[in-house]
A protein has these predicted regions:
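Flexible loop/turn segments at secondary-structure boundaries
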Residues: 41-44, 79-83, 144-145, 290-297, ...
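N-terminal catalytic cores of NTP/NDP-binding nucleotidyl/phosphoryl-transfer enzymes
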Residues: 1-88, 243-265
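Anion (oxyanion) recognition and catalysis
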Residues: 64, 128, 156
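Catalytic adenosine-cofactor/nucleotide-binding cores of aminoacyl-tRNA synthetases and other
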Residues: 261, 266, 287-431
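Active-site cores that bind ATP or allylic diphosphates and position pyrophosphate for catalysis
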Residues: 132-302, 308
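A glycine-rich helix N-cap at a beta->alpha junction
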Residues: 92-130
Length: 431
């Protein structure tokens, strides 16, 4: 018996269908299904950061295709403290280690209000360029507005139970003795260095002492201040082990993918969400991390970042979307030299879609056509144009510079019989 084709036959459709089945069993409203992507704000966003948001958006598209409304929430973790200076950043940032990135000056001038806003803007800019629609939320605004106050209160009021459960789940004993909350010391302005010692539930305040902490390999001294942190005014933040759960419930999130590097945090957050906050945790998909060509993890702070901006300098938005939509499983080694292959692969998918290339395997054909439609955000073009191998375009582009460059390249391609007319698509690829 052949497997039933769901939606457009892609992994996006399978996940969306599983999500709908799960939500119906839970009896939750399906009027608007929110999917989420967390955005790190501590360093330059890389292609993997973009991937998390793009895939979540893809699930939203698949939900739309199945007849349901969806919304992508992009959540910037700009309350996180700066743990180290990313490669190539100004050394004066050393004075701001452990301070929330939303309170650190913009290291690249005055174009943004803070370090965190600058880093977040780079990722949001890339999402705009590839045509992703989203609702942006920043952690600093969410905490300051008190949106998470009810969830924080529930979590801190159950800290003894929570500390034991975290130890049972991931063998971490830290939160048996310490509250899973990082106050911002109101004297030195740092996170992580102030030890949360007691929660006053009636006042919704955390008592702390700024005693210092080890961040990575660096010991950060505390200033000795003793104070209190109001959980409803953004004077601190939850630890990652419990923070996801709080925002899932507060923002009504139904889907969020995650990388295997934070698997332990997700396990704990799932329990917190379901068992403490009485909000069945979102459906998840686990993805492997992107690696560079040497097999090293692409890192915001290690200096081997492949950014979406770098990619879009040479490739089209469609090439990024194809990279991220065609599959989710397996580790991939990526670099700029993959762009020509993906550009030509997109043309192949387009030829399959318009039946210029025959594919005898029907399920494969449906899947390839489905991926093409999702790359085009369910609004594919009405017809296809003649394709030019991308490496030939790159070669021709290297021959011509200056004024009239596009015209000269077009004339050369026309001479070779590769094009008949100058189109917007051709000009975009040349430029």
């Amino acid at each position: 018996m052949k497997d039933k084709i769901i939606g457009k036959g892609t992994w996006l459709d399978k996940v969306a269908n599983s999500l709908i089945i799960r939500e119906k069993k839970l009896g939750r409203s399906l009027d608007l299904i929110k999917v989420e992507s967390g955005l790190g704000a501590s360093g330059i966003p890389h292609i993997g950061s973009t991937g998390d948001a793009v895939r979540a958006y893809g699930i939203g598209l698949a939900l739309n295709n199945l007849g349901f409304k969806s919304e992508l929430i992009t959540y910037s973790d700009d309350m996180d403290g700066l743990r180290k200076i990313p490669t190539g950043f100004p050394l004066w940032l050393d004075d701001y280690i452990a301070k929330p990135v939303s309170t650190i000056p913009d290291p690249f001038g005055n174009c943004h209000k803070s370090y965190g806003e600058h880093m977040s803007s780079l990722l949001l800019e890339s999402l705009d360029k590839v045509g992703i629609k989203f609702n942006y939320r920043s952690a600093s605004d969410v905490y300051k507005s008190g949106i998470l106050a009810r969830e924080i209160d529930c979590i801190l009021s159950n800290n003894e139970l929570l500390g034991k459960k975290i130890f049972n789940l991931v063998s971490q004993d830290k939160y048996i003795d310490v509250l899973p909350y990082f106050p911002v010391c109101n004297n030195c302005g740092r996170l992580y260095v102030a030890r949360a010692e007691k929660y006053l539930s009636n006042e919704r305040k955390v008592l702390y002492s700024c005693s210092g902490s080890k961040i990575g390999t660096k010991k950060i001294s505390g200033c000795g201040h003793k104070g209190e942190s109001d959980i409803s005014k953004g004077e601190g933040k939850l630890a990652w082990k419990v923070e996801f759960a709080a925002r899932w419930k507060a923002l009504d999130i139904r889907f969020e993918a995650y990388g295997k590097d934070i698997m332990d945090s997700v396990r704990v957050n799932d329990w917190v969400s379901t068992s403490l906050l009485n909000f069945p945790h979102p459906l998840h998909v686990k993805y492997e991390m992107f690696l560079d060509k040497r097999g090293k993890k692409i890192s915001k702070s290690a200096g081997n970042v492949l950014t979406p901006q770098m990619w879009l300098k040479y490739g089209t938005p469609a090439s990024i979307l194809l990279l991220l939509f065609k599959r989710i499983s397996g580790t991939r080694h990526i670099g700029l030299d993959d762009i020509p292959t993906l550009m030509d692969e997109y043309d192949y998918y387009e030829d399959i879609y318009f039946d210029k290339i025959k594919e005898n395997n029907n399920s494969k054909k449906i899947k390839l056509k489905g991926i093409y439609e999702y790359v085009n955000k369910l609004n594919p073009p009405y017809n296809t144009l003649k394709h030019i191998p991308y490496r030939i375009l790159v070669q021709q582009a290297s021959f011509f510079t200056g004024e009239g460059r596009s015209d000269n390249i077009f004339l050369r391609l026309k001479k070779y019989g590769l094009v008949e007319e100058k189109t917007d698509d051709l000009i975009n690829k040349i430029s």
